Amino acid sequence: MGAMVPRTLLLLLAAALAPAQTRAGPHSLRYFETVVSRPGLGEPRFISVGYVDNTEFVRFDSDAENPRDEPRVRWMEQEGPEYWERETQIAKGNEQSFRVDLRTLLRYYNQSEGGSHTIQRLSGCDVGSDWRLLRGYEQFAYDGCDYIALNEDLKTWTAADMAALITKHKWEQAGAAERDRAYLEGTCVEWLRRYLELGNATLLHTDSPKAHVTHHPRSKVEVTLRCWALGFYPADITLTWQLNGEELTQDMELVETRPAGDGTFQKWASVVVPLGKEQNYTCHVYHEGLPEPLTLRWEPPPSTDSYMVIVAVLGVLGAVAIIGAVVAFVMMMRRNTGGKGGDYTLTPGSQSSEMSLPDCKA
């Protein structure tokens, strides 16, 4: 498996750019690249997608009518033609390398060319509020399974199987780790800073989470309490459950943070508790968009007795209002007839002088 084309980028005026006001961090720049072979349907398809802080900002698709690196957010339209031409050439170079790698891995695994196979790559960097590298990524998977990855020391590789060991030895001889480390510690961090400056208004805002707790019966003696955090940005958030002030790390089920589809994120954490003991458990939500952490409990609905009392009171009040309206109407009619309401009666079959029914005609 050959080394990928390096993402060597020209940092235009990077040193001259004034530091932009940025959120405290951390921040991330990541690229996800995938190639899928499709025997009998033409060349393998290659897709590259770039993310800044979990926001897709660029994309390349070899199946497009005119394959080019394209902006996915409005703020990337500030980049000029030279940038897009350069990034397009990088993507096309990686596309060709991936196609060669597909054929190489077919040999390593002694597979035929008749089936469909996939190579995936994750590369990128995470930085802290001081712009120092927190972690670099250079990871590969084949047919959905780990293949080879650059370790956190950015100096050594971990191979998942015997085939990946062949790639590891080749890359060690070629000094691939040193090249990748230089990119991750330098170029990647600088371009992340650049993208954050371009998308400052969008990327550096915060949306505080809306949180609530739901109640789900499990059995006659247990219930599940689920703490929801919705509509927050950025994606970094912490949810914990506590019992009388002690964290329940081992007993808590926690899902990965998920995109909501509108640029915000959602997450939940649940815990199983004894029925009747729900009020002893509290959910705690930590997010940079909150002035202070949230503490929530499950709020039980009003009891049936309380509900019936409320309905009864509302019924009595409604009846009183109706009676009052009738009395007011009668009093008004008495005033309109000079107080002789007792002499104004209609006997069965009689008609008032002011109202008559039309004749029925055959």
Curated annotation (Swiss-Prot):
Q: From the record, give the cysteines joined by S-S bonds.
A: 125-188, 227-283
Annotated spans, Alpha-1: 25-114
Signal peptide as annotated in the record: 1-24
List the residue ranges of the region (Connecting peptide): 299-306
Residues bearing Phosphoserine are 353, 356
Q: Where is this region: Disordered?
A: 340-362
Q: Which domain of life is it from?
A: Eukaryota
Localization per record: Membrane
Q: Where is this region: Alpha-3?
A: 207-298
Q: Which residues lie on this side of the membrane: Extracellular?
A: 25-306
Instruction: Spell out where the chain is glycosylated.
Output: 110, 200, 280
**Membrane topology designation:** Single-pass type I membrane protein
Q: Name one GO cellular component term.
A: plasma membrane
- Give the start-end ranges of region Alpha-2: 115-206
Q: What residue ranges are annotated as transmembrane? A: 307-333
Q: Which residues lie on this side of the membrane: Cytoplasmic?
A: 334-362
Q: Which SMART domains match?
A: IGc1
PTM field: Polyubiquitinated in case of infection by murid herpesvirus 4, by the viral E3 ligase K3 (mK3), leading to target the protein for rapid degradation by the endoplasmic reticulum-associated degradation (ERAD) system. Ubiquitination takes place on lysine, as well as serine and threonine residues present in the cytoplasmic tail. Hydroxylated serine and threonine residues in the cytoplasmic tail are subject to ubiquitination via ester bonds instead of the classical isopeptide linkage.
Pfam families, sorted: C1-set (PF07654), MHC_I (PF00129)
Entry's Gene Ontology BP terms: antigen processing and presentation of endogenous peptide antigen via MHC class I via ER pathway, TAP-dependent; negative regulation of neuron projection development; positive regulation of T cell mediated cytotoxicity; T cell mediated cytotoxicity
All copies of domain Ig-like C1-type, residue ranges: 209-297
Q: Which UniProt keywords apply?
A: Disulfide bond, Glycoprotein, Hydroxylation, Immunity, Membrane, MHC I, Phosphoprotein, Signal, Transmembrane, Transmembrane helix, Ubl conjugation
Q: How does it assemble?
A: Heterodimer of an alpha chain and a beta chain (beta-2-microglobulin).
Tell me, in a sentence or two, what this protein's role is: Involved in the presentation of foreign antigens to the immune system.
What is the name of the protein in this document?
H-2 class I histocompatibility antigen, D-K alpha chain
